[in-house]
Regions:
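Phosphate-ester processing/binding pockets and catalytic centers
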Residues: 1-203
Length: 203
């Protein structure tokens, strides 16, 4: 089974221009989980949150995530200033589901095994998890030619070291688009970056 770990940086409100969703797909999640545990213990933390880390701490974690070349990193960033239909931003769950479909497409389309998708439970309303699962399954089975099982679940990030790792990655990507800080972003090995809306992003 292939597992997709999802976390985001920013929000879908009007405060900041960009919103980022990052996806980590590890070949060996145990390696990442182990060094995340060590990092938490060494720094006296209860949970890793990208916004609360120092730059050296973020550098350390990003280096560890990349070091074995066994984790695929992808992301989608949305330019909220160029969303033409305001309804998409009024219903944040619909917008979130829509963005995730672009982020998941290539991974699910080329997978030859069951897929598990795990999100932070602070991301969407609990009652919306079923609508997300149904939406992704419809896309996968009717448009992407996927023939295996898909499970969508959510957990509190404090219980998932992989979600915490995704948070650090999302934070580094967010800093690039919001603050123009490329230092951490350039240390990431990005498999796929999606800028939405496609033709007018950043204009």
């Amino acid at each position: 089974m292939k597992t997709l770990f999802i976390d985001e940086s920013g929000d879908l409100g009007t405060k900041e221009r960009y919103f980022v969703i990052a996806m980590l797909v590890p070949q060996r999640s145990k390696r990442i989980v182990n060094f995340m545990r060590r990092f938490i213990a060494q720094n006296g933390l209860s949970e890793v949150k990208g916004t609360l880390l120092t730059t050296p701490q973020k550098q350390n974690l990003i280096h560890q995530i990349n070091t074995a070349n066994d984790c695929v990193i992808s992301y989608i960033v949305v330019d909220k200033n160029n969303i033409s239909n305001p309804k998409l931003l009024q219903d944040k769950n619909i917008m979130y589901n829509y963005l995730l479909s672009f982020l998941f497409k290539n991974t699910i389309k080329h997978a030859n095994e069951d897929i598990s998708i795990l999100l932070d439970n602070h991301t969407i309303k609990v009652g919306s998890i079923n609508s997300l699962a149904d939406y992704i399954k419809i896309k996968a089975y009717t448009q992407w030619g996927f023939k295996y099982n898909i499970h969508v679940g959510f957990t509190d990030s404090k219980h998932s070291k992989m979600i915490q790792a995704a948070d650090v990655v999302a934070n580094a990507i967010y800093a690039k688009y919001i603050y123009g800080k490329n230092h951490l972003y350039n240390r990431l090995t990005i498999n796929e970056s999606i800028r939405f809306p496609f033709n007018i992003f950043g204009k």
